[in-house]
Amino acid sequence: MDKLADLNYTLSVITLMNDTLHSIIQDPGMAYFPYIASVLTVLFALHKASIPTMKIALKTSKCSYKVIKYCMVTIINTLLKLAGYKEQVTTKDEIEQQMDRIVKEMRRQPRMIDKLTTREIEQVELLKRIHDKLVTRPVDVIDMSKEFNQKNIKTLDEWESGKNPYEPSEVTASM
């Protein structure tokens, strides 16, 4: 276990791989050598990182199948990212979780639309009432029937003997 986590051991293995590749490929004009070396280095680092992780996970976990599946999916996704792919490998559990999340969101959307629609209708009704109160209407004839001081006034035709009782009359006084 100490050998797996030892940085010097890892660097010596990488140097050994590079020396081996240099001895195999004698052509100094080889253009793809740095890419091949970097891919092999990454694969070796993944190998060295994943084996201790999987050993620890298998010892501590009760459900080893899920752990192995998760580790494999993670390694494959890492390799796909390194290769430049945007797609990822997912497990059935992840797909089911995403589908559940999407279904919950789809159920939530109509409720939100209903709430927003109700609020918008209420706002439109309120704006209509405010508009109706603010609109000035042209007045041709003033209706005085509702005025307080006009309730008991009689017209000239309604007065007894056709005489206005409020008109001053001539008063003569003795001296």
Curated annotation (Swiss-Prot):
A single GO cellular-component term on record = extracellular region
- PTM annotation: The N-glycosyl content is primarily Man(9)GlcNAc, with a small amount of Man(8)GlcNAc.
Q: Which residues bind Ca(2+)?
A: E120, Q123
Keyword annotations for this protein? Activation of host autophagy by virus, Calcium, Enterotoxin, Glycoprotein, Host endoplasmic reticulum, Host membrane, Host-virus interaction, Ion channel, Ion transport, Membrane, Metal-binding, Secreted, Signal-anchor, Toxin, Transmembrane, Transmembrane helix, Transport, Viral ion channel, Virulence
InterPro entries noted in UniProt: Rotavirus_NSP4 (IPR002107)
Q: Where are the transmembrane segments?
A: 29-51
Per the UniProt entry, the glycosylated residues are N8, N18
Enumerate the Gene Ontology biological process terms.
monoatomic ion transmembrane transport; symbiont-mediated activation of host autophagy; viral process
What single Pfam family name could you report for this chain, choosing any that match? Rota_NSP4
Tell me if Cell membrane is a UniProt keyword of this record: no
Cytoplasmic domain ranges by topology: 52-175
Which compartments is it annotated to reside in? Host rough endoplasmic reticulum membrane; Host membrane, Host caveola; Secreted
Q: How is this protein positioned relative to the membrane?
A: Single-pass type III membrane protein
Family annotation (Gene3D superfamilies)? 1.20.5.430
> What does the subunit section of this Swiss-Prot or TrEMBL entry state?
Homotetramer. Interacts with the immature particle in the viroplasm. Interacts with host CAV1, early and late in infection. Interacts with host integrin ITGA1/ITGB1 heterodimer. Interacts with host integrin ITGA2/ITGB1 heterodimer. Interaction with microtubules blocks trafficking to the Golgi apparatus.
**Function recorded in the entry:** Plays an essential role in the virus replication cycle by acting as a viroporin. Creates a pore in the host endoplasmic reticulum and as a consequence releases Ca(2+) in the cytoplasm of infected cell. In turn, high levels of cytoplasmic calcium trigger membrane trafficking and transport of viral ER-associated proteins to viroplasms, sites of viral genome replication and immature particle assembly.
Under what name is this protein listed?
A: Non-structural glycoprotein 4
